């Protein structure tokens, strides 16, 4: 008799917190929060995004690179030098950890774009194109993050081990996000761990996006190349498209990605009904379907979104100037035992 296998559905753990006053928080706090959700992952991916960690080089684009071999590093550096001036480059500091293995070359570059490299004068569009080129055309090279005064630290392992490996206890940031991965549709590899990032956007995600194919094709019309074959990648690019390029408020972008049901739209007053009908029609291919909970980080804050049926957990809390979002109440209380609101 054949053996029956059931698909393990996603149980990723996510957390994000920030100081509204810009107060910096040590990295051991986000590691502690993620460690409390150890059972939500399976050791095939952990990662963090941190904002405000490079104040002495805040005006430079900080490229965090994952490089499989020396040739990838050589080709990446040649490409970067052809378009940018490199202020400084160095290995990303790490600490030996027996639970983290098969590590790529981890390198960071602090860059200024050469004036002639800007596309129609738009510096950020040029940086995005560089990321697309490196990820798609240089074998063994992957841009983990490229924003200013922020960085993504990720890899294969449990998040608390990845955090210790990257020495996150030595960093301070005014925004932290963390993710423990339980991959369901793609393999566990260093580039596939969360967060996914573009410019100062970073996305962590728990769930499954069934609209990946439609979303991917839609983004490709605007020049984005989804090379990781993972659903979370499309979310990072989608928010860049809607907010930075289409200049939509983040509240409207959220209503596009997590659109109202048509039945709900029909019950709205006339003005709202017309607006949401238009959004659903114009941005039909930007609608994200499936069970999911998402935390989006950017230089000015964090945003939590969940699917319209709330099929993945997402808890929010506040204490003073601190805001928290997490998959579980316990992750928040581990670092803020008695929040003022939850």
Where do the model's predicted regions map?
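Conserved short alpha-helical segments that host acidic/polar catalytic motifs at enzyme active sites
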Residues: 1-342
